[in-house]
């Protein structure tokens, strides 16, 4: 197969953006935040140059709804020069309210994802024109959840290094810059001391908002 060589490109941090070519097959994976692409994902996707490379889109959402995310991904990838041959919405545990999509993806999810990929493979390189979503896209919503560090923080700096938008500084690792933070919860997920958390009252209000 001409796709035997696999290369992982991490766009979590700004940096060098790859250029793709017609013989490449790309799988672009993005999260859905409140039914939209996080603005940082949209900005970084726009830097890609595809030159008619084939793309399969994967939108990961926390078992609420992905709404306009997949359409937004496709619109951006079309402008970048990708040829979209497939699109998948995959459920994962919600990054804020863990009881939504808890333990997902599970074995059945993985089985279905493999089946979807096989369908796309058998379909061949025929471009798809339609994916779910509406334009204009729904407004972007900012959740007022900005993680902070408790007394267990060891100041190891992992959160500073791994924050995709640079919202945590070495000078003050306890808090984050609420003007920059996108509430992705990466710092909570990767903290080796489990020292980062959200305001519990705000988590409860966010849960109620998501349930509506």
Placement of each model-derived feature along the sequence:
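A mid-sequence, solvent-exposed acidic-amphipathic segment
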Residues: 127-164
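Active-site-proximal loop/hinge segments that shape catalytic or ion-binding/gating pockets
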Residues: 209-211
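FMN-binding flavodoxin-like domain, especially the glycine-rich phosphate-binding loop
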Residues: 1-12, 17-30, 34-142, 201-206
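Iron-sulfur cluster-binding cysteine motifs and their immediate structural context
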Residues: 149, 154, 158-182, 186-203
């Amino acid at each position: 197969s001409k796709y035997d060589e696999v290369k992982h490109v991490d766009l979590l941090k700004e940096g060098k953006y790859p250029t793709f070519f017609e013989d490449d097959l790309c799988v672009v994976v993005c999260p859905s935040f409140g039914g939209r692409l996080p603005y940082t994902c949209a900005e970084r996707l726009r830097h890609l140059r595809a030159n008619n490379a084939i793309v399969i889109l994967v939108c990961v959402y926390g078992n609420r709804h992905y709404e306009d995310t997949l359409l937004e991904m496709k619109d951006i990838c079309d402008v970048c020069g990708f040829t979209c041959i497939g699109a998948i919405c995959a459920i994962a545990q919600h990054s804020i309210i863990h009881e939504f999509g808890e333990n997902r993806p599970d074995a059945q999810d993985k089985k279905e994802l493999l089946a979807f990929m096989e369908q796309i493979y058998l379909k061949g390189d025929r471009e798809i024109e339609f994916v779910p979503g509406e334009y204009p896209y729904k407004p972007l919503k900012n959740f007022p959840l900005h993680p902070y560090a408790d007394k267990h923080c060891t100041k190891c700096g992992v959160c500073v290094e791994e924050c995709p938008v640079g919202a945590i500084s070495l000078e003050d690792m306890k808090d984050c810059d609420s003007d920059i933070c996108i509430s992705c919860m990466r710092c909570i997920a990767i903290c080796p001391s489990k020292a980062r958390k959200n305001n519990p009252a705000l988590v409860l209000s966010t849960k109620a908002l998501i349930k509506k």
